Curated annotation (Swiss-Prot):
The keyword Iron does not apply. It is found in: Perikaryon; Cell projection, Dendrite; Cell projection, Axon; Secreted. This is Diuretic hormone class 2. The lineage of its organism: Eukaryota, Metazoa, Ecdysozoa, Arthropoda, Hexapoda. GO terms for molecular function: diuretic hormone activity; G protein-coupled receptor binding. Its main location: other.
Amino acid sequence: GLDLGLSRGFSGSQAAKHLMGLAAANYAGGP
């Protein structure tokens, strides 16, 4: 359970950074 929790937290953090990066790219390249 602990290992899965850490893995999930890490994946969630990476996903959040990725989404934030996409949002920033879209904002910068928007009209």
